[in-house]
């Protein structure tokens, strides 16, 4: 008999049956940070990148990835996402800038959207890197985390390293 939720009694992987869970309004917000050089920051703001503005492309990539999360993560349930929104902001840091990518995903369903939010910011960061690598291959994608989640049986979660967001 298996003691793990994602393995059957024969010890093989399985997708958990969520049909008995109640459908509730659920939201998840994730964040990913990309450290960039002053040179890249200037190129973006001067609109001199050969591939064009990386942010709209990264935004679309994040939305598309959120919708495809179940195809990327084996035990993730395919769900009908009701909304995905991404945000981008630059913060000055020592030796450059930090691009902070945020994603909020919403659903009325019987499973959460944490993985969808995390997948959205990760795909957006990878797309940003792809759009900008001709100028700066030394970018660092770092600190991907779940900022908050609301709804569901276990209630709300707020990452202890981020302020409570309302």
Curated annotation (Swiss-Prot):
UniProt GO BP: Mo-molybdopterin cofactor biosynthetic process
Highest taxon listed in the record's lineage: Bacteria
Keywords: Lyase, Molybdenum cofactor biosynthesis
Signal peptide: none
Gene3D superfamilies per record: Molybdopterin cofactor biosynthesis C (MoaC) domain (3.30.70.640)
Pfam families, alphabetized: MoaC
Top EC category: lyase
Binding of substrate, residues: 75-77, 115-116
Keyword field contains Phosphoprotein: no
Catalytic activity line of the entry: (8S)-3',8-cyclo-7,8-dihydroguanosine 5'-triphosphate = cyclic pyranopterin phosphate + diphosphate
MF terms (GO), sorted A to Z: cyclic pyranopterin monophosphate synthase activity
InterPro entries cross-referenced by the UniProt entry: MoaC, MoaC_bact/euk, MoaC_sf, MoCo_biosynth_MoaA/MoaC, Mopterin_CF_biosynth-C_dom
Family matches, as CDD domains: MoaC_PE (cd01420)
Coiled coil residues, start to end: none
Pathway membership, UniProt: Cofactor biosynthesis; molybdopterin biosynthesis
Catalytic residues as annotated in Swiss-Prot or TrEMBL: 130
Iron found in the keyword field: no
Protein task: Catalyzes the conversion of (8S)-3',8-cyclo-7,8-dihydroguanosine 5'-triphosphate to cyclic pyranopterin monophosphate (cPMP).
The protein's assembly and partners: Homohexamer; trimer of dimers.
Family per similarity comment: Belongs to the MoaC family.
Name this polypeptide is given: Cyclic pyranopterin monophosphate synthase
Protein's gene: moaC
